[in-house]
Structures are given as structure tokens and as C-alpha cells.
């Protein structure tokens, strides 16, 4: 992140407020106003409140769950959480570490990356995904759920509201199809969706938004992976397909992804069909109901 410059009076205010808030937590509203005035906002929901801290929110508890879970059980670099604040409708604000570095999207588009730099970053990405996939699922079933399995999930691919958890991949896939039974899926969506949703998959912990803007780079390596709001337990292909649910227009990024993490090209074809024909299945509009149930 670019270093900000301040005049003397602003620096004194920042030092005073930062010192006070370290030992005596100020109201959230005060800290957010202070951050917006003296630091910066990082759209859509992040405010920098000191030289080394940000507050993100309102967000769903599943994001906090994921940050704490991944930090505890892996060595994947994630921001440290300091405290939370309650918000309306069951949401929270999370005060966390501001990781020093530049997001990969900005770095790639602004300066480009040499082949050696890309190789180093992709090696780190491979290691991070491998660590997430090594985590044992909380149950033996093929669930789709948050880190703790207790909270609802969120995902821009699905819609603005929480959804799930699901007791099986079949139930999740039916949800993605808008309730269309697997028996009529081929007629409704075509062979790619039918074939993908007829397979059995392992369950892996998944970031589910592992795109360049959420990867912080420092000294040529991954310093942190941020924005864990979409993460949870998903079918094994979800990480790969969700990386492609993004508008980052650099073919060399996607080429590197194909070499860094397990590929699921058939599932990506199925997902692209659903993105076109039935996007945001979590939005309440229409949903197939079997008259026999």
C-alpha cells in the first residue's frame, strides 16, 4: 500500500488517537470517522484506522471463522485479527492487521511480472492451496458449509445473502441448478452440467475468491491472502472454478493457475453454463419445486 503523507498537526492527532485506541478501545463510529478522514477507504467495506490496522465490515461471521481457523491450523499467511464489533442483522466488524505489500492485481497490471516472479508467486499459491486442501473436513459427509459448519455461507457467485449449509454436494448442486432435479438437468442445462453434477467429489476447505486483488505481495512473494468472506467447505473443484469467476484480464495469470492448482476443466465448463443461464441462484426470484414433494 502506498505510504500516506501528513502535516505536523495531522501526525500529532494520529499518534494521539492511535495511542488511546491501543489501550482504551474507542467506539467503532469514532474509529471509522477517524480512519476515513486521516487514512483511506478500501472499497467496498474496509477502512484503514491506523498505520497498521484496518476495520472491515459489516461482514458475516463466517469470514471471522475462516480467518481464525486458517491462522490456527495452517501456515497460510492471513491477517491477524485483533477484535470484533457487533453490527446489525447478525453481522460484525473485524479489526485486523493491515498487511504491508501490494495486491497482485495492481502489481501485475502496473509493472508486469517477469517469468521468474510469476513462478515464485505461483509456487506460493500452490503451497497455500495445498495446505487448505490438507485440512480434514469436520464430518465424513460431503458437506458444503462454513469453517465451523454452523454459520451460513456467502459468495458473490450465489447472491448477496447467506445460504446453506448443505448436508451433501447433491443438495448444493441442486441449489445451483435452481431446484432442477438431476434427472432433467441434461434437458435444461445441457450435458456439461449434468455430467459435472453427477460425479462424486471430495470436500476441501476453499478460499473461493482466490483472485489477484486478494493476494498481497511483498518482496516478490505472497505476504498474505485476504478477503475470506466466501470461504468454507466445498466440492473439490470450487477453488478452481471460482478463480475464473473474475474479470482479471491477464491470460498469463490463468496459465499460471492451471499449473499451480488442480484443474477441473469439465466443471469449469459446467459452471460457465450456469453463470450464463442461472446466475445468482441465491436471489429469491424463481425456483423449481417438484410437485411430488
Regions found by a protein language model. Give the residues of each.
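Juxta-kinase regulatory segment immediately upstream of eukaryotic protein kinase catalytic domains
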Residues: 1-36
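ATP-binding pocket architecture of kinase catalytic cores
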Residues: 36-159
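Domain-wide signal for the mature, well-folded portions of proteins, strongly enriched
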Residues: 58, 208-211, 227
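An alpha-helical support segment within catalytic cores of ATP-dependent transferases
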Residues: 86, 118, 125, 131-208
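Short, glycine/acidic-enriched loop or turn micro-motifs at the edges of active sites
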Residues: 100, 212, 230
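Active-site Asp-x-Gly
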Residues: 169, 200, 204-205, 218-270
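ATP/Mg2+ or Mg2+-diphosphate-binding catalytic cores
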Residues: 279-293
Amino acid at each position: 500500500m502506498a505510504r500516506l503523507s501528513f502535516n505536523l498537526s495531522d501526525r500529532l492527532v494520529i499518534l494521539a488517537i492511535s495511542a488511546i485506541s491501543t489501550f482504551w478501545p474507542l467506539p467503532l463510529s469514532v474509529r471509522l470517522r477517524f480512519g476515513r478522514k486521516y487514512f483511506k477507504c478500501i472499497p467496498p467495506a474496509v477502512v484503514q484506522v491506523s498505520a497498521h490496522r484496518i476495520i472491515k465490515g459489516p461482514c458475516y461471521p463466517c469470514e471471522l471463522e475462516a480467518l481464525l481457523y486458517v491462522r490456527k491450523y495452517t501456515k497460510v499467511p492471513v491477517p491477524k485479527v485483533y477484535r470484533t464489533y457487533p453490527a446489525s442483522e447478525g453481522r460484525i466488524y473485524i479489526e485486523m492487521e493491515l498487511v504491508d505489500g501490494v495486491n497482485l492485481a495492481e502489481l501485475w497490471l502496473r509493472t508486469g511480472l517477469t517469468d521468474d516472479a510469476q513462478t515464485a508467486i505461483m509456487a506460493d499459491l500452490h503451497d497455500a492451496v495445498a495446505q487448505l486442501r490438507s485440512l480434514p473436513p469436520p464430518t465424513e459427509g460431503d458437506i458444503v458449509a462454513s469453517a465451523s459448519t454452523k454459520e451460513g455461507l456467502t459468495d458473490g457467485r450465489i447472491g448477496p445473502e447467506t445460504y446453506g449449509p448443505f448436508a451433501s454436494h447433491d443438495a448444493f448442486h441442486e441449489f445451483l441448478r435452481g431446484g432442477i432435479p438431476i434427472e432433467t438437468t441434461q434437458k435444461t442445462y445441457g450435458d456439461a452440467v449434468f455430467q459435472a453434477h453427477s460425479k462424486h467429489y471430495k470436500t476441501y476447505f476453499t478460499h473461493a475468491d482466490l483472485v489477484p486483488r486478494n493476494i498481497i505481495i511483498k518482496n516478490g512473494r505472497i505476504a498474505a491472502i485476504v478477503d475470506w468472506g466466501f470461504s468454507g467447505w466445498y466440492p473439490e473443484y470450487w477453488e478452481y472454478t471460482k478463480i475464473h469467476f473474475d474479470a482479471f484480464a491477464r491470460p498469463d495469470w490463468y496459465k499460471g493457475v492451471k499449473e499451480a492448482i488442480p484443474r477441473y476443466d469439465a466443471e469449469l465448463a459446467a459452471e460457465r453454463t450456469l453463470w450464463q443461464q442461472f446466475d445468482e441462484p441465491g436471489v429469491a426470484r424463481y425456483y423449481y419445486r417438484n410437485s411430488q414433494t
